[in-house]
Amino acid sequence: MSRILDNEMMGDEELVERTLRPQYLREYIGQDKVKDQLQIFIEAAKMRDEALDHVLLFGPPGLGKTTMAFVIANELGVNLKQTSGPVIEKAGDLVAILNELEPGDVLFIDEIHRLPMSVEEVLYSAMEDFYIDIMIGAGEGSRSVHLELPPFTLIGATTRAGMLSNPLRARFGITGHMEYYAHADLTEIVERTADIFEMEITHEAASELALRSRGTPRIANRLLKRVRDFAQIMGNGVIDDIITDKALTMLDVDHEGLDYVDQKILRTMIEMYSGGPVGLGTLSVNIAEERETVEDMYEPYLIQKGFIMRTRSGRVATAKAYEHLGYEYSEK
């Protein structure tokens, strides 16, 4: 069974997110630094009648990178072609996509860090000079064909910016770091979602739900759906702070937004390794999770909330982790 706090997309959530997706920057809640910069770059590109410079959006899953790509296309008044790194298996796949673009269009590549190197190399000249050279045929009869491309904007999204090659990263003129959402912004998102789906929710309930949603809109919207079920069955249909606390407690989501896996990580560090330092590989084995899963899904939030510190020797549980789980902490 999937974690309810998993920030990767589940089931029918793609349809839900499309329904909730804002259309323009003025409707987009949060990520103010990224929005303010994009507003300037977009307006400048429109005034010059040029394609917007290529954009790299990076950050943990569920923070609105795909939504931002659609918003950028809407602000520019152009079409968006969407694909993902794992889907583009060979250079010919990329050429076919690029060939369909109209002047000024946006090409959005999700998980761009997963592009094969052979595909990435074709992308270099397309991004920099709007042309591609491809080989037609095989053996002695093969020949190089030069294709001019219309000016376009590539928007790449990644959860692992460190895995991008330097040549690819250098070709993005605009970068946007999507960060975990502030509590006030996430509360507003919960209230907006409830309004769109005609749910009755108090401000206190929206605030509590936002507090436990790990700074991630995708998780907040998922929890809202589950809390609505509790409100219908255990209450009068109104989502208030009492039913919200009861529902999230039953779902093993505590007041810091930690679930049983997060707590297992911290308890393992404290009980088995006296708080650390402990290596990521060792920790992963002890909690029966893949190293990459711990590093990408669990650790970022635990670090951001101050429960774990990274050191040269390994991960260390902080005094806050001890206090949160009811352990006595002593300085080493």
Curated annotation (Swiss-Prot):
Belongs to the RuvB family. It comes from the Bacteria. GO terms for molecular function: ATP binding; ATP hydrolysis activity; four-way junction DNA binding; four-way junction helicase activity. The RuvA-RuvB-RuvC complex processes Holliday junction (HJ) DNA during genetic recombination and DNA repair, while the RuvA-RuvB complex plays an important role in the rescue of blocked DNA replication forks via replication fork reversal (RFR). RuvA specifically binds to HJ cruciform DNA, conferring on it an open structure. The RuvB hexamer acts as an ATP-dependent pump, pulling dsDNA into and through the RuvAB complex. RuvB forms 2 homohexamers on either side of HJ DNA bound by 1 or 2 RuvA tetramers; 4 subunits per hexamer contact DNA at a time. It comes from Streptococcus pneumoniae serotype 19F (strain G54). SMART domains: AAA. It catalyses: ATP + H2O = ADP + phosphate + H(+). Residues 1-181 are annotated as: Large ATPase domain (RuvB-L). Homohexamer. Forms an RuvA(8)-RuvB(12)-Holliday junction (HJ) complex. HJ DNA is sandwiched between 2 RuvA tetramers; dsDNA enters through RuvA and exits via RuvB. An RuvB hexamer assembles on each DNA strand where it exits the tetramer. Each RuvB hexamer is contacted by two RuvA subunits (via domain III) on 2 adjacent RuvB subunits; this complex drives branch migration. In the full resolvosome a probable DNA-RuvA(4)-RuvB(12)-RuvC(2) complex forms which resolves the HJ. Its EC number is 3.6.4.-. GO terms for biological process: DNA recombination; DNA repair. It is an enzyme of class 3 (hydrolase). ATP binds at residues 20-21, 62, 65-67, 128-130, 171, 181, 218. Has 3 domains, the large (RuvB-L) and small ATPase (RuvB-S) domains and the C-terminal head (RuvB-H) domain. The head domain binds DNA, while the ATPase domains jointly bind ATP, ADP or are empty depending on the state of the subunit in the translocation cycle. During a single DNA translocation step the structure of each domain remains the same, but their relative positions change. Signal peptide: none annotated. This is Holliday junction branch migration complex subunit RuvB. Gene3D superfamilies: 1.10.8.60, P-loop containing nucleotide triphosphate hydrolases, Winged helix-like DNA-binding domain superfamily/Winged helix DNA-binding domain. Pfam families: AAA_lid_4 (PF17864), RuvB_C (PF05491), RuvB_N (PF05496). Residues 255-332 are annotated as: Head domain (RuvB-H).
